[in-house]
Amino acid sequence: MGRRRGVELYRAPFPLYALRIDPKTGLLIAAGGGGAAKTGIKNGVHFLQLELINGCLSASLLHSHDTETRATMNLALAGDILAAGQDAQCQLLRFQVHQQKGSKAEKSGSKEQGPRQRKGAPPAEKKSGAQVHPEGVELKVKNLEAVQTDFSNEPLQKVVCFNHDNTLLATGGTDGHVRVWKVPSLEKVLEFKAHEGEIGDLTLGPDGKLVTVGWDFKASVWQKDQLVTQLQWQENGPASSNTPYRYQACRFGQVPDQLGGLRLFTVQIPHKRLRQPPPCYLTAWDSSTFLPLRTRSCGHEVISCLSVSDSGTFLGLGTVTGSVAIYIAFSLQRLYYVKEAHGIVVTDVTFLPEKGCGPKLLGPHETALFSVAVDSRCQLHLLPSRRSVPVWLLLLLCVGLIIVTILLLQTAFPGFL
C-alpha cells in the first residue's frame, strides 16, 4: 500500500488559521491573512463550494470577503452566522446563499481531487459585502455587530465558541477572562477571570458547563462564573512528575449510540521543548464526574489543534510540525496519520458534517477531515470505510460451513461420499 498523503483542495493567497463547514450548504469557510503589517499579504474569509465530481471531492472559490487590516485567527459557526476572532475583537458575519433560477451547475470537471477554477471566475478579492455569481449561485456576506473581547497589554482573542442553541457565544483571550455575549446583539451577559495568563481553549457543553484551559497549567470546569472543579490529569497520569505539562485543547463530544451521552476530550503537551521531547497525551473524561476515563500517548510531535466529529466517533489532531491524524474517540487508537502533511504548523482541523450535505459529499468513505495551516493550503484527509468483519474470519466461516454441510450429508445419507 502506498504512503498516505493528504489531498490539496485549495490554496489561499494568505496564511490560513481557521475553517468551518456549513452542513446545510456544503460551504467550506477558510479564514486568515497577513495581519495589519504592510507586507502585501491580504486578510480575508473565503467561502468554498464543496462538490462531489466523478466520485472525487472538489472545492472551488465562491466568494472572498475582505477583512481589511484584520486577520481572522479563529471561527465559530451557528447557522448562517460566523463569529470571527480578529485581533482583540469578535466580528459577527452573516452569509446568505441563493440559487438563481434558470442556471445549471457545471457537471464536468477534473477526475483529480483538488481545487478547480470556475469558468469566468471573479477576481480573488472583493470588497466587503460583494456578491459573486458563478454558475447561478449568489452568495452575500454582511458584517453584523463587533465588540472588543480582550483587554490585555497585547490584546488578542484566542478562541470563540457558541452554546448548544446558538443564543450565546463565549470568548477567551490573552487577558485570561471569559466573556459571554448574546447573539446577535453581542451584549455582554457574563465576565469572569478564568486563568492567570492567556486562555488556550474553551468549550461549552449542552448543560451549560464551560471548560477552559490556560497557560497556567490548569483546566477548569465552570457553571456560569462558579468554579465546579479542576481537571486532575498529571497526578495519576503516565507522565513523569518532573516534566511539566499544560492543557492545549479541549472539546466536548457525543458518545456514539448513547442518547444524551457526553465525553470531554483534552490534549496535554509538554510546557517546554526538550532535546528529547516527551510525548503528548490525549485524554477522555467522564462529563459528569470529570474524572479521566482513558489516556493515550499521541506521539512526540506537539499537538496544535483538536476536533471531534459530530457523532463523537472520531478525533482529529494537527501538530506544530504539520502532521495530521485521526483517532477513534472510544479507544483513542490512531487510525490515520500523515507525517508533515503541511510541513508547518497546522492551525485548525474540522470534520465533514454528518448531517445535511455531509453524507452526500463523503461518498464511500467513513469520515473526512479537513486541515489548514500557515502554508496557505487546505487539505482533505479521507478515512476509507473499515470492514466490519475481517476477511480471514469470513474465509474461516466459509470453510467451516462446507465441512459441517459435508458431515450432515454423510450422516443423513450413509455412503454419500
UniProtKB/Swiss-Prot annotation:
Guanine nucleotide exchange factor (GEF) that regulates the assembly of the coat protein complex II/COPII in endoplasmic reticulum (ER) to Golgi vesicle-mediated transport. Selectively activates SAR1A and SAR1B by promoting the exchange of guanosine diphosphate (GDP) for guanosine triphosphate (GTP) in these small GTPases. SMART domains: WD40. It is a single-pass membrane protein. Residues 1-388 are cytoplasmic. The gene is Preb. PANTHER family: PROLACTIN REGULATORY ELEMENT BINDING PROTEIN, PROLACTIN REGULATORY ELEMENT-BINDING PROTEIN. The lineage of its organism: Eukaryota, Metazoa, Chordata, Craniata, Vertebrata. Residues 103-115 have a biased composition (Basic and acidic residues). Its main location: endoplasmic reticulum. PROSITE patterns: WD_REPEATS_2, WD_REPEATS_REGION. It comes from Mus musculus. Keywords: Activator, DNA-binding, Endoplasmic reticulum, ER-Golgi transport, Membrane, Nitration, Nucleus, Protein transport, Repeat, Transcription, Transcription regulation, Transmembrane, Transmembrane helix, Transport, WD repeat. One of its GO terms (biological process) is protein transport. The modification 3'-nitrotyrosine is found at residue 10. This is Guanine nucleotide-exchange factor SEC12.
